[in-house]
Amino acid sequence: MDFGLKGKTAVVSGSTAGIGFAIAAALAAEGARVIVNGRTEARVATALQNLRQLVKDADVRGVSADLGTAQGVAAFLQQIPETDILVNNLGIFEIKPFLEIPDSDWLRFFEVNVLSGVRLSRHYLPGMLKKNWGRVIFISSESAQQIPTEMIHYGMTKTAQVAVARGLAQSVAGTGVTVNSILAGPTASEGAGVFVESMAKQQGVTKAEIEKQFFSTARPSSLLKRFETTEEVAAVAAFIASAQATAINGSAVRAEGGVVQSIF
């Protein structure tokens, strides 16, 4: 299937590693011109090098900017004033009991996980509407529906992303622009890898045993019974960004390995 992305420009926030990097690679493989973003020039340069090795003739460019701040977004937009596809992937997470989460953490999580996408979408949507074609995708999580008690502030931001995506989709109804969110499940990203390795060392067991333990206790409802790969999530994002996915609009697309115990 031809995704129809040749000649399209795609911005992927927070794309030097993990799900964001995998999405950048998937879009580049489909012929899109991909803008890679990270906070430091070093990480961006490494990501570009890896992408060019992974995807033959990849058309990629990097822009270092902290999109978790208004100033960082403004600097980024000066260099990349328009795009056809926007993937709001930037996000942070942290395990912390509710009673220990200060106001500053709530505000920081909201600004990075939610406002980064709001600011980018607010800028890029008018250009998409003018061309009558565009794709906006928010990378959310199953935590949007099943708020994790060990990081309620993170879950709050994932729910907010779904709400923003649905509202934006309704605001551009009847146009060639679609806005969706993807609810990813527990994924073998850089952060998850650090967590698993740390727990394995603490308990003196293998990483495979920690993964099995995680899915038997923390996410027992998972049908996949393992961490998703970043490429599995990226494949969903690439299709939603495609010209073939016009009928998918305003949706919270579940790609969470069956963790959410609901048929709808």
Task: Kindly label every feature range from the protein language model.
Residues 84, 92, 99-118, 133, ...:
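Catalytic Tyr-X3-Lys loop
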Residues 126, 170-171, 246:
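Alpha-helical segment proximal to the catalytic Tyr-Lys
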Residues 173, 178, 248-250:
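Short, small/polar-rich loop/turn modules that mediate ligand/substrate recognition or access, typified
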